C-alpha cells in the first residue's frame, strides 16, 4: 500500500509537469503532444532499415512515437496528460510500483531510430515513468531508418555516426561536425578503427553521463553543439580521466573555461 500511495503521488507530479509543458507549447504555438515519426517521414526520405536488436536506448534521445495512436495521452516531454483515476493512470502507477520495487522495469520497449532520435512503437508508458525518474537508459529493440544521403552537414555527420557505431555501440556520440569520431578515438588514446570493449564502453558511458549532466546544468541544450561536441572541445584541454576525478563543481568550472569554444561550434567551420 505504501508503494501504491507513493506511485499516485509521483503520478500527480508527472501530470503537473505534463500539463505545464502542454500549456507552454500551446502558448508558444508549438505542437503540444509527442512527435509522430510516421508524420515526419515520406517514402523519398528513407534509404532502408537496419535491425539493431536489443540495445540500451538513451532516455533523453527518445522524442516521440512511431504512429499517432494515443499521443494525446502524453505531453511533448512524455509526461502524462490523463487523470490519475483513468485506466492509463492506473497502468502508469503499476509501472511506477515496479520501478520502485525489487522487480524494476525490465521489459524492453520497441522503437525506431531516425537521425539519432528514437520513436516508440511499444512501451510509451515505460518511457514516461523512466523519464519522470530521470533514468539514463532503457533496453529496447531498435530498427534504424536510414535517411537518403545528401551532402548536408547533418546527414554527413549521421552517416559518420552509422559508420563508427559498430565500434562504440553508443548512441550518446552524436556530433555536429564531420570528422569528430576519429578525433574522439585519438583523444581517448585509441586507433581510429579501435573496437571498444564492454568495459571501455561502460567506463566511457558512466563518465560521459557525468559530463553531460554538468553540460546540461549550464543550459548546454540551448546551444547548437551537442554534449558530444562539448566533450571533444573539453578534451583538447583536459584528459578524459579527469571527468571522474573532479568534483561536480570542478567539472562545471572546467566546462565553463572552454564555453566560448563550445558556443562557437554553431557557426564555425569544422574543427
Regions found by a protein language model. Give the residues of each.
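Glycine-rich loops and low-complexity Gly/Arg-rich segments
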Residues: 87-89, 133-136, 144-147, 163-168
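A short, basic-hydrophobic beta/loop patch
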Residues: 104-119, 125-157
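Short phosphate-engaging motifs
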Residues: 126, 180, 207
